[in-house]
Each structure stands twice: as structure tokens, then as C-alpha cells.
Amino acid sequence: MQPDLHCRTLAAHTLKHFRALSPLTHCMTNDVVQTFTANTLLALGASPAMVIDPVEARPFAAIANALLVNVGTLTASRADAMRATVESAYDAKIPWTLDPVAVGALEFRRRFCLDLLSLRPAAIRGNASEILALSGMALGGRGVDTTEAALAALPAAQALARQIDCIVVVTGEIDYVTNGQRTLSIPGGDPLMTRIVGTGCALSAVVAASCALPGAALDNVASACCWMKLAGQAAAERSEGPGSFIPAFLDALYHLDVEAANATN
């Protein structure tokens, strides 16, 4: 099935609801991107909470609006905490999102992520290599870097979405968002987004937060991808390199006006 182009008008409408709700987003993410992820959520209008201790994380998951599990710096003890927290979110019917960082390259995290799938994530966000590995269609990849084009992983993403009954996002030069039946494409962004650490992990947090919104989950998640692409483009236009891109990107998220972007593109 051919993907449809995501509508920016819908993304503008969704962003208004997102900012009004300010979803409380519980992030169990990796140590490298904690600050950038929290700042990304804040800049867009969400409320991040970086609660990781298992004593606190399990009960907190039941009161948050959404949960992100990112396995970038996974350890055995952290895996236990994540599993217990996901169980709490699942029991409380809180949507949770999986970011299976480097799932194809390392066996421990691959087995852990596959085990978590039984707890029905609302969304999965990964690059092409990660989605191919999680679906069982391929192993490998170079950690957080992808060795595959996003489009090559689309059949795997669609099959995984149908199997788990969730939204799957494959990110790349063009992002693809699918529920297994319908697929949306989101072009845009800028190569500078790949020259800093954390844009993909931060996107996963925004995807998680968007899953707390009412309405069609596919459209909400695609809108989240659209916001990040638009902010990346805007930031790159006033950046000289990776160092100046990060603050420009956060500013672009904070000032993001999708309707104005529609008028100029």
C-alpha cells in the first residue's frame, strides 16, 4: 500500500490540542539524552517527568498521561524497572511508547524489547534497522545509526503494527507512520538533525506524549513527526552547525506555528 502525505493542517490543529492538554509524559529514557528530551517536550508544551527509580516509577506510570521506554543505555536493573513500570501503565490503560535503540545489534536488548511487546505499546518509534530487527525481518545495524532507508523497512513496520495493534514510526529522510492498514509519510527536516545526539530519542518522547491526545492515534503521531520536521527545517536555516542548531531547534519548537509554515511552503 502506498503511503499518503500527512496533512499539515491537521498537524496545526493537533498542536493546539497538545499545548492545551500539556500531557504529563513519564520518560524512562537513556542517560545521554535526558536533558534534551525534557527540553524538547517543554518547548512544545508538554510536561516531562524523568522518573526512573523503580520504587517511584511504577506508581508514577499510573498517574502520568503517557510513558516512554527508551532502551539506549539499558542495564539489567533498569530493564527490571522498565518492565515493572510498563506493567503499571498497561494495567492503568496509560499509553506507552517503545524506542528500541540498537535492538538489532545487541541480544540482551533485543530479547527485552520483544518481551515488552506482549504489553501492547501504543506506539513504536525506530529507524529502519531497528524496525526491521524488531519485526524479525533482519538483524544488525550500527547502534543508533541506520543502515537501511526508511522506505525499505515500511513492509516490516506495517506487519509489526498489525501484529501488535499499534502505531509504528520509521524515521529517516522521510518518516513513515503506519497502523498496518493506513500509512502516512512526513517529509522535511534537515541533515543537521542527524549531527546531534538525541533528536530521534526526543521524537519518541513527543510521539509518546501525542498518544495521550484524544482522536485518531495515527494522525496524532504523524502530527508529532511533522512538528519535529518543521522545527528542524526552521532551526537549520539560522544555524551554522550542530552547536548552534540545538538552541535554535528548541526555540523553533517553542515558536512553532504550523499554519504559518503551511503558508510559506
Swiss-Prot record:
Reaction(s) the record says it catalyses: 5-(2-hydroxyethyl)-4-methylthiazole + ATP = 4-methyl-5-(2-phosphooxyethyl)-thiazole + ADP + H(+)
Cofactor or coenzyme needed: Mg(2+)
GO biological process: thiamine biosynthetic process; thiamine diphosphate biosynthetic process
CDD domains given in the database record: THZ_kinase
InterPro entries registered for this protein in UniProt: Hyethyz_kinase, Ribokinase-like
Xref: SUPFAM superfamilies: Ribokinase-like
GO terms assigned for molecular function: ATP binding; hydroxyethylthiazole kinase activity; magnesium ion binding
Entry keyword annotation includes Phosphoprotein: no
Role summary: Catalyzes the phosphorylation of the hydroxyl group of 4-methyl-5-beta-hydroxyethylthiazole (THZ).
Protein family: Belongs to the Thz kinase family.
Protein name, per record: Hydroxyethylthiazole kinase
Recorded name of the encoding gene: thiM
